[in-house]
């Protein structure tokens, strides 16, 4: 079972257990667009392989999300993106999208990892 794990301030917390990986061009381009919901415990992971400026937009996404930009497993930025109009950008090699509120308590410099079990 793949899960998203947050290590910060001496605590370890599971952020998601229903994890999907956007590992193709089409999956990365679609992201969460046109989905009707994003249940608690879900995550969408965008692995890019190397750090670069990564932009997320919320066009076609009808719900708020939390986005976590990672570089080498360290949190570079955490943002709450608003439905339809949200926009976020940071340098990262991995970006994780979570339901709004799931990344509460995640801070820059913390560790977040995709754990295969």
Q: Residues of each region from the PLM?
A:
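Compact, glycine-rich, soluble single-domain proteins
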Residues: 1-117
């Amino acid at each position: 079972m793949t899960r998203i794990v947050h290590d910060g301030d001496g605590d370890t917390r599971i952020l998601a257990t229903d994890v999907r990986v956007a590992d193709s061009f089409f999956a990365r381009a679609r992201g969460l667009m046109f989905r009707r919901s994003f249940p608690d415990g879900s995550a969408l992971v965008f692995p890019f392989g190397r750090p670069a400026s990564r932009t997320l937009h919320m066009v076609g996404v009808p719900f708020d999300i939390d986005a976590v930009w990672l570089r080498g497993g360290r949190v570079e930025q955490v943002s709450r993106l608003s439905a339809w109009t949200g926009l976020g950008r940071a340098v990262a090699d991995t970006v994780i999208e979570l339901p709004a509120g799931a990344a509460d308590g995640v801070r820059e410099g913390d560790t977040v990892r995709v754990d295969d079990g």
